[in-house]
Swiss-Prot record:
Belongs to the Maf family. It catalyses: a ribonucleoside 5'-triphosphate + H2O = a ribonucleoside 5'-phosphate + diphosphate + H(+); a 2'-deoxyribonucleoside 5'-triphosphate + H2O = a 2'-deoxyribonucleoside 5'-phosphate + diphosphate + H(+). InterPro entries: ITPase-like_fam (IPR029001), Maf-like (IPR003697). Pfam families: Maf. It comes from Corynebacterium diphtheriae (strain ATCC 700971 / NCTC 13129 / Biotype gravis). One of its GO terms (biological process) is nucleotide metabolic process. It is an enzyme of class 3 (hydrolase). This is Nucleoside triphosphate pyrophosphatase.
Length: 198
């Protein structure tokens, strides 16, 4: 039995590898914008959980005997959900808006096993530094934050501009190991069954 990651996120892959798991990687093809449009009026946590569930469900049929993990993260800042900025200009704009503020990074998880499914969100509070304009522009031009929820990374260059987090650090990076552990336990699996040395 394998863990299958329904994501192309290098951060999610890195979390699992650092935790002793070498997952199969099978990015799901989900129209995130269309799904979000269909969820108008739902809570931010519901939206992020629905994205994670859609990703896991998109590939679960191809891996009926494995554990499929879908994940999605978005930043809740000033009452608005923000996903990936995708461009340098949008990244600069976002950072000028979020610097010096505190926001919530919401990560949705859907873990599908042969024994059932577990859907859960994890919310971590992030306080952004008062980064100056030159550093914001330089950071955006590295390309690192363009494909990251909230336009930042905690575990790389973006770590310079995060003053504090309250909550699960792995969730901020893209996948909460405590949530995945709870999902595996609920399905009757031990985490150690999926470590590389077993």
């Amino acid at each position: 039995m394998n863990i299958v990651l329904a994501s192309s996120s290098p951060s999610r892959l890195s979390i699992l590898r650092s935790a002793g798991v070498e997952p199969l990687v099978c990015p799901a093809d989900v129209d995130e914008d269309a799904l979000l449009d269909s969820l108008v009026g739902r809570s931010p946590a519901d939206k992020v959980a629905a994205l994670a569930q859609a990703k896991a469900e998109a590939i679960a049929g191809d891996y009926p005997d494995d554990v499929v993990i879908g994940g999605d993260s978005m930043l809740l800042l000033d009452g608005a959900l923000q996903g990936k900025p995708h461009t340098v200009d949008k990244t600069i704009e976002r950072w000028k808006q979020q610097r010096g503020k505190t926001a919530e990074l919401i990560t949705g998880h859907c873990v599908i096993t042969p024994r059932g499914r577990h859907v859960e969100t994890s919310t971590t509070t992030v306080t952004f530094a008062h980064a100056d304009d030159a550093d914001i522009e330089a950071y955006a031009r590295t390309g690192e934050p363009l494909q990251c929820a909230g336009a930042f990374t905690l575990e790389a260059i973006g770590g310079w501009f995060i003053d504090s987090i309250t909550g699960d650090p792995s969730s901020v990076i893209g996948l909460s190991l405590p949530v995945v552990r709870r999902a595996l336990y609920a399905a009757g699996y031990n985490v150690s069954e999926f470590w590389n040395n077993n």
